[in-house]
């Protein structure tokens, strides 16, 4: 049996741009892609913290160090510049690997710079001003 597990997430990134007239996808700063172990073309789910919208798309590489989180194509109807989003990637693991796998969890600041990098999906950094689910 394979289990679909959290592979990585970028938590509470700020959308910097939205372009309705683009072929699709989400543009992500290459530094954030590295931190979250995302590859160009990899499927991600985007959750908009501000309005609850959820969608599935794929990642394209943005300029390194730019902080870009760009919503492209039809998704720009749902997610707008300034919105806070969570980008989530999942992986399929066999049962043994799923029980020991540690995801990449990336918290960012308002400029989409890495604040904290860890493996606990429920961890909340002190600077995040969020409630821990634990």
From Swiss-Prot:
One of its GO terms (biological process) is pantothenate biosynthetic process. Substrate binds at residues 57, 73-75. GO terms for molecular function: aspartate 1-decarboxylase activity. Pathway: Cofactor biosynthesis; (R)-pantothenate biosynthesis; beta-alanine from L-aspartate: step 1/1. The keyword Lyase applies. It catalyses: L-aspartate + H(+) = beta-alanine + CO2. Pfam families: Asp_decarbox. Its EC number is 4.1.1.11. Binds 1 pyruvoyl group covalently per subunit. Heterooctamer of four alpha and four beta subunits. Belongs to the PanD family. This is Aspartate 1-decarboxylase. It comes from Mycolicibacterium gilvum (strain PYR-GCK) (Mycobacterium gilvum (strain PYR-GCK)). The gene is panD.
């Amino acid at each position: 049996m394979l289990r679909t597990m959290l592979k990585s997430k970028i938590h509470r990134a700020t959308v910097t741009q939205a372009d309705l007239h683009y072929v699709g996808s989400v543009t992500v700063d290459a530094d954030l892609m590295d931190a979250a172990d995302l590859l160009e073309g990899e499927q991600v789910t985007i959750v908009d913290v501000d309005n609850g919208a959820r969608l599935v798309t794929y990642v394209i590489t943005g300029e390194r160090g730019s902080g870009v989180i760009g919503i492209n194509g039809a998704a720009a109807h749902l997610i707008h510049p300034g919105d806070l989003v969570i980008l989530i990637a999942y992986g399929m693991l066999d049962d043994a690997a799923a029980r020991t796998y540690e995801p990449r969890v990336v918290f960012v600041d308002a400029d989409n710079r890495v604040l904290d990098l860890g493996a606990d999906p429920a961890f909340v950094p002190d600077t995040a001003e969020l409630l821990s689910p634990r």
